[in-house]
Amino acid sequence: LTALTEQPYGMILAVGPTGSGKTTTLHAMIGHINTRERKIWTIEDPVEIRQPGLRQLQVVREVDVTFQSAMRSFLRADPDVIMVGEMRDVETASMAIEASLTGHLLVSTLHTNSAPETITRLTDMGMEPFAFSDALLGILAQRLVKRLCGKCREDYAASDAEREEFVRYLGEERLSKLTRSEGLRLWRAPGCQDCEYTGYDGRVALHELLVVNDEIRQAI
């Protein structure tokens, strides 16, 4: 992902449901390339994270500051990197693709369930596959899950029912590569004083990254 953010132009999308940490991920990507030499502009609704060195604009519909109007201004000003908080409509998506094809690195978010489904979503929005296939560098799908407490977590031998659940999703061959010689072992946390007896300590992001190479572009 860091290699993708270092590209001079193209489009990177972070996808997932509301509350899955997409905005935080976008700012982490921007933070990786945020240097004095780069002109980085954002349009967000609202601005949730302030980051020094960026020119951050917030949507204010009452005075016609929208994703679309901001993108039109951005393209005239020619920044190096553009962050669009969310591609909500066809016009914003079209301008995002145009920007990424004309020498800008663009990062944005979209509400889809997985990285491959994003291709279908863009097509359903009316985007031409030949255009966005050339623009796309990668799609990062993510979810936030609870993290087990590191103080009280313990491993245990998985039950037959739990093992069958893993086989159903992964298949026997893939599961065998993840299993130790003593069999499938999982983790659980009964709770302790450190985690206030919840068994959990914060959340962690799970990611699915689709890097768009020539083969995938041809398929699109």
Task: For each feature predicted by the language model, list its residue ranges.
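Short, flexible helix-loop junctions that flank or precede catalytic/ligand sites
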Residues: 1-220
